[in-house]
Amino acid sequence: VLACTMAVFTYAQKSDGIVYWSYEAGYHFDFDLDGKIDLTVPTQTKDVPIAEVFVYDANGDGYFDLCEVDRSCAADQLIHWRFYYNDGNNNFIDPQDVVYGMAVGDKALSADFNGDGAGDVAIRRDNEYGLWWLMHFMAMAPDVNLAFGISDNDYLLAGDMNNDGQADVVLYDRGNWLCSFTPSTTEYKTPDFANQDIANMQFGTKNDIPLLLDFNGDGYDDMAICSVNDEEVSVNLRDPATKPENNGYSKSGRGSFDKTFYMPSGLKPTCVRGVKLSKGGTGLS
């Protein structure tokens, strides 16, 4: 497993960090959002090109793990989800390969959707039957097979938008946002897409990379957009006091640019993710 390089600093804030990734450059973590790189980890899968990554706690131990999406397998033409688990010191070990979804055409999303501490995988298949979701859960739960989306251009995101400890499905299409909160009171706590809890709201443009992170430590993920050309990240904070719509995310149909900060200079990420540090778990001393 490939090693990482790190800076030494003291982490003392409650907000999430951000990771900027590209296949060639690997993962660049900015834990305290000061525009400086705190940890560098190479892309773990080196034998094949990786299409995208997800960074979250996929085994319930409190440390962020890596999930690298491999669409290159010509033999079975399926998506191979390659999980690498953090040992607590940012060494990524015990790789696990999950095969789910078609390599060509299916959109990919990975998160803990039912709050059981295990990472789950989901694909969305856009065809004549609609914007169709298929979800597979690592633990005992019935799979999801339901339609939900804005358009076939949707960018798939997952974040805790209602502070219940499990990931909700969030979609972004050229500045438009849509979200359905995962029910946390049902037996299996799996997405049912019955409600559009965030819908018809605007924040960002078609040129931005969307991401979700809890910027202010209130337990709710906030919406953010990364402008790679400007090397900036702008955040729309959840604030029910000033944003009465969409469960505290918009006013008059729009989010607001509440916070803007710089990303580390010189990076050209193709994927940007928020990183939760539930144990203060940067792995740094």
Give the positions of each predicted feature.
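Sec/Tat signal peptide C-region and signal peptidase I cleavage site
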Residues: 8-12
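Bacterial N-terminal signal peptides
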Residues: 1-7
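Trp/Gly-enriched beta-strand/coil motifs that build multi-repeat beta-propeller-like domains
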Residues: 13-285
